[in-house]
Amino acid sequence: MEKIKKLVLLSTFLLFPEILNAFQDIINPDVTTNRWIIESNTKYLNKASARSFKGELEAEIVVDISEQRLYLVKNKKILKSYPISSSKYGEGSIQNSFKTPLGMHEIKTKIGHDAKENTIFVARANTNKSAKIIKDVIDTEDDHVTSRILWLDGLELGRNKGEGIDSYNRYIYIHGTHEELSLIHI
């Protein structure tokens, strides 16, 4: 089985329900996909399960970069699956590379809980402006961070935590986008 490139998040809380429910009527992974994702991520999910057992986690998130999918996992079972868009620059952890880091992460900071849907954030601050949702499958010049920000912290020293590669210091997020329809067609 081909090893997938992945970013695994250990969430101490469930993501914002409105984000998680955004595509629930569009995508439902089949049993074969479920088994493959779980088997491919056993090492990470075992670590996550140990934290879950201690009561630290409600769910885990597995992001499969090669498939451009986010999976919500609990007790090694996929609950939901969503399309995502990772960095157009590829995978990597080097500071200022604009690449998507791999490995285990946790959601350290949640921003935007009270923000209106489609609110634009700049440098994690609410601008009180609303993004226009693009209804075509295009890549706009704007790269708005919208609705919510889940700021990630790396958990693997030397891979996504530490000087020059630290995901939190690189401002790595899961966030909303105004190009929502493009996610469905990736």
Where do the language-model regions lie?
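Cyclophilin-type peptidyl-prolyl cis-trans isomerase
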Residues: 167-183
